[in-house]
Amino acid sequence: MTTKKGMKKFDPIAYKEMVKSYQDEDNPTGWFDSIYTDAQGDHSAVFWADLEPSPYLLEWLKNCVFKHTGRKAIVIGCGVGDDAEALSEYGYEVTAFDISPEAIRLCKNRYPDTTVNYLVADLFDYPSQWAENFELVYECNTIQVLPGKYRIQARDAMVSLLATQGYILVSCRRRLKGEQEDDIPLPLIKRR
């Protein structure tokens, strides 16, 4: 498999085996931290990271009919921080979280002067003050890798973060033809 410059070679078999081992232990999100830890502090070594904001998010921000300034946004599974930083640049007060402590460390090191509030948190057990607190709830390429029952729980949790009259924006990569819904998806398959 061709990799981005500076990335370790991605082994899809080892990846699927590793994810399956966590899922077999009913720990559907535990494997995320191992990917970030394996990157050894190099955000470009996280094989699913695009290292730029989602073009779909940027398009939405540019075409949105309301002002962004002063609104609260939350980024679920923020990864290495590109989307959170884009939202901040558009004027949002951004809380961005990931279940991986190592991902949050990468964000803070990558963006040392940021105004984004990067936190370690679990979508299934987030701080109570987050409930119904955000005008924008943004999720990109995270819940798609969860097994079915957890995707349903994740959708419910996302809705519970949303303030009245707020927006949920979800962006994900589609599965390949023939892939089953609960198959462990291989990352970085993009079609535009």
Q: Can you describe what each PLM-predicted range is?
A:
Residues 138:
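A conserved beta-strand element that flanks and buttresses the S-adenosyl-L-methionine
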Residues 141-145:
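Short catalytic micro-motifs in class I SAM-dependent methyltransferases
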Residues 133-134:
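Local beta-strand N-terminus motif with an aromatic residue
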Residues 2-74, 79-130, 146-192:
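Class I (Rossmann-like) S-adenosyl-L-methionine-dependent methyltransferase catalytic domain
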